[in-house]
Amino acid sequence: LRRVVQKLCQRDIAGICIEDKLFPKTNSFIGEGQPLADIDEFCGKIKAGKDSQTHDEFCLIARVEALISGWGMEEALKRAEAYHTSGADGILIHSKKSDGAEILTFLEEWGRRCPVVIVPTTYYDVPTDAFEKAGASVVIWANHNLRAGISAMRDVSRRIYREQSLKGAEGTIASVKDIFE
């Protein structure tokens, strides 16, 4: 991580987010009880990253996977506190529950000790301002544009196949000029 942070700083990259999953990483939405990194070892990585940064503005965000991996709130808060104490500039917390309650509880119990980043992929029904009021600092709409792109590509592909022509689709897609600008 030291070398990565140094290289990112050399290139004026604003920050990095590292997560407490073990290698090889598996998708957070697959199963529960996934193994997580040892807290002390992960804290050592955070310290190493922060010690090697060459710009004061560089941010290291620690992604806590305890909730989404099924380890529970107590474990999530314990890890977040350890990572924050070790120098993390912010905490990213994630949940696969659809009601947002787990994230709102975390934010309430966390108490704005440092910035918190959330990724509401599964709890999209909860208005963003509810999280802002509870203390979330950053909201990442992680894959909605990708998913919208997939739907649009499917629609255009179906239309081209159905009409056996590009003409009908041309008015619904970006121009070639738009791609290169």
Question: Where in this protein do the model-derived segments appear?
Answer:
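Alpha/beta enzyme core
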Residues: 1-137, 148-154, 158
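Extended, intrinsically disordered, low-complexity segments
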Residues: 51, 144-181
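Active-site loops and adjacent core secondary-structure elements that bind or stabilize anionic groups
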Residues: 140
